[in-house]
Amino acid sequence: MLMNRKAKTVNVLEGPMTESCAEFPARHVFIKCPECRRVIDEARLHDNLEVCPRCGKHFRVSGRARMRMTVDEGTFEEWDANLASEDFLSFPSYADKLKSVSERSGERDAVVCGKGKICGCDTALFFMDANFMMGSMGSVVGEKICRTFEHATELGLPVVGFTVSGGARMQEGVTSLMQMAKISAAVRRHSEAGGLYITVLTDPTTGGVTASFAMEGDIILAEPDALTAFAGPRVIEQNMHKRLPKGFQRSEFLLEHGFCDAVVPRGEIALTVGELLALHEGHVPGLGAPHEIVHTGRRGKKLGHLFKRSAAPKTALEIVKQTRSADRATAGEMISLGLDGFVELHGDRYFGDDAAVVAGIGWKDGRPVTVIAIERGTTTKERMRRNFGMAHPEGYRKARRLMRQAEKFGRPVLCLVDTSGAFCGIGAEERGQGEAIAQNLMEMSGLKTPIVSVVTGEGGSGGALALSVADRILMLSSSAYSVVSPEACASILWKDTERANEAAEALKLTAPDLLALGIIDGIVDDRGLSHEEIAGAVMSSAFDAFDTLGRLDDATLTNLRYEKYRAIGQYRTM
C-alpha cells in the first residue's frame, strides 16, 4: 500500500532579518470595582480621582494622594515629617510591623500634616493615611495633629482635616487612648482663638478618631458612603446578634441623623472647602463657585408668580389665609432669587436634620451672611417632606448651632420666618420642643452679632419667635404674626370657630398693627410684586439694616436688643 507522506519543506524568509524590536500595544492594568463589579482601566480610574466612573464608588487613597487632589499645586509645606513611632511598650511584633509598613508605604506614620492653599486660601492641613496600619491613632498621629492645631492657632489659620482610621493603635496601649483628649484640647484652644475647623470624613473613620477630632469640626463634610462610627458594624452585630440595615453608619446615615453638614463627592471637595474658607475669611468665593446662584436672563423678567388674588385683603383673617397660600414666595425662593450664592449646612449634631429649617451661609454683593429660614415647600410632596414649615426641636437646634458659628466668625444673621407654629407631636415633645425654643430665645438675646428677622408669611406663636429675637424685625405687608391662630383663639376662648374673623381683628396680628404696638421695626411692601421683586426687597431691607447695626460694638448691640424687648408690654400700677 502506497502512503502519502508530507514532504519536508523549509520556510523561506521573504525579506532580510532586522534587529529592531516589534512594537506591542501599551499594557493596561484593569481593576474590578467591588461595588458594581465593573472592570475599570487603572489609568481611567486614576484620572477620575480613584472614583468608579460607573457607580461612583470612592476607592481609598493615600494621604499624600489626597493632598495632591486638594491643595493648590506647589503650595504645600509639610510639618513634622521627621516624627516616627517607637515600640515603647515592647509590644509583641510591633517594631517589625512598623518597619515593614513604613517600607511598604514610604511614610513614617499614619498622617501627613502641613500648610498650603486651597483655592487660594491659606490653611493648615492634615491627611490621615489608611495605608499605614489602617490609619490607627498612636502617639505620632496624636502629636502631629496636636502640633498642627497649635501652629494654626499661632498663625491664625483655619484647619482642614481628612480623617480615615480604624481607631486606636492597640500596640501603644492607653497612651493611644490619651491622644483623643490631647487633640481635643488643642481643637478647643484653636476654636477659642476664633479658628475655623473643617473635617472631611472618608472611608472608614471609626473608633477613637470618630469619638474625638473627627466630630469636632465647625463644619463636617463627608465623602459618599464613607463608614463613620464609634463602634464598627461587626462589633455591633456581634453584640446585638442581628444584621444591621443597609447604609447604617454611612455618610448618608450621618447626614439624615444630623451629624454632618453635607455629603460631597471627591471631585467637588476642593472647590467646596475653598468656598467655605473664603466665606469664613469674610469675602465671597470667586466666579464659578459650586454654590454660586446664577441669575442670567432674569433681570427685567417676571419669572416669579404674582399673588393670585382678585383684590387686596380687606380683613385680618383674609391676610392670615393669604399667608397660607401655595402661591406665596417661599423662603427657598427668596434665597435663590435674592442672594448671589448659598451653601446649605445640615444637622443639629444631636438627633437629626429638620427639612423645615433651611440654614447655611449665603452671600450678596460681596458680603457673607448666615441665613436661617423656615421653609414650607411648594409642591404637596415637598410640603410633606418639610412638614408644612412646622419645625421639630432639631430644626431649632440646627439654627442655634449656626447662630453660634455666626457669632464666632463675625457674620450677621438673617432669619426668614414663615410658619404656623412649632410642630406639636409626641416625638417633638420627647425630644424637648419647649427646651429647644427656650434655648434659642436665650441665645439670640445675647448673640454678639447683628440679627435681622423678616416675617415673610405666617408668624405663628413660639415657633416663629424662636427665630425672631432680633435687632430688627421686619414684616411683609401681606404677612401676619400672632400668639395663636385666629381659628384656635376663637375655639379656645369662645368655643366657636365661626368667630375666627372677630378673633383675627382682636389679636392685632397685621403688620400695621404690630408696627403701632412697637413689636416690629418696619414693613416691606410686597403688594403686587413678583417673587423675584419680593426677594429683592427683603434682601435690600435686611442688608440696609445690617449696615446700620454693623457700626455698633458688641456691648451696645446686645444692650439695645435687651432694652428693645424690655420695653415691650403695657400695664398699670394699682
Describe the residue ranges of each PLM region.
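Terminal-region recognition feature
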Residues: 1-198, 204, 216, 223, ...
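Glycine-rich anion-binding loops of enzyme active sites
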Residues: 206-213, 229, 463
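Catalytic-face loop-and-helix region of soluble metabolic enzyme cores
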Residues: 239
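Active-site pocket-lining/capping segments in soluble small-molecule metabolic enzymes
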Residues: 224-226, 233
